[in-house]
Design a protein with these regions (language model features):
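Short glycine-cluster motifs
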Residues: 1-31
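A contiguous loop/helix-start segment that scaffolds small-molecule binding in enzyme catalytic cores
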Residues: 21-23, 27-151
Length: 151
């Protein structure tokens, strides 16, 4: 199970919500091992407003905050998941502006995933039409069974 999926399951939350964000971007920041392509920088990815799952970046939180605040706002929810799905897992619910201080308080220096997005806030959203009782698709015909005789 990928860390982002395991972490979302532990949080018991959806990563997409109608009219808030319908896209999840899995990414990381540049590190010692390799740089990131310019077109995949957080400054560019952040323009989408998508839910972000940022791996391998706990030591780059200053950059994460600086790159994303113009697009998401300093009060945007951020969740740090240390050692997702492990017995010693820790979850820190904070904001873009507060995440560095919280991570320092908890002494987290590695093995953490950073989620950023409005889907994690106290938001009101319209339920997806996909689950509406009157929404018909190939696997659901809104309770109207076809008669075999009519075929």
């Amino acid at each position: 199970v990928p860390a982002f999926a395991g972490a979302a399951a532990r949080l018991a939350t959806e990563l997409t919500l109608p009219e808030i964000s319908q896209t999840i971007i899995l990414t990381r920041t540049a590190g010692k091992a390799s740089p990131m392509p310019v077109r995949e920088s957080l400054e560019i990815l952040g323009q989408s407003g998508a839910t972000l799952a940022i791996h391998l970046s706990i030591r780059n939180l200053g950059y994460v905050e600086q790159a994303l605040t113009p697009h998401y706002g300093a009060d945007c929810p951020a969740i740090i998941v240390y050692r997702a799905t492990w017995p010693d897992e820790e979850i820190i619910v904070t904001t873009l502006a507060g995440m560095r201080a919280r991570v320092r308080e908890e002494k987290i220096t590695r093995t953490a995933l950073v989620f950023v997005g409005r889907v994690f806030g106290d938001v009101k959203f319209r339920d997806s039409r996909l689950y509406a009782p009157d929404f018909v698709h190939v696997l659901r015909n809104a309770g109207k069974k076809k008669s075999r005789a009519a075929e």
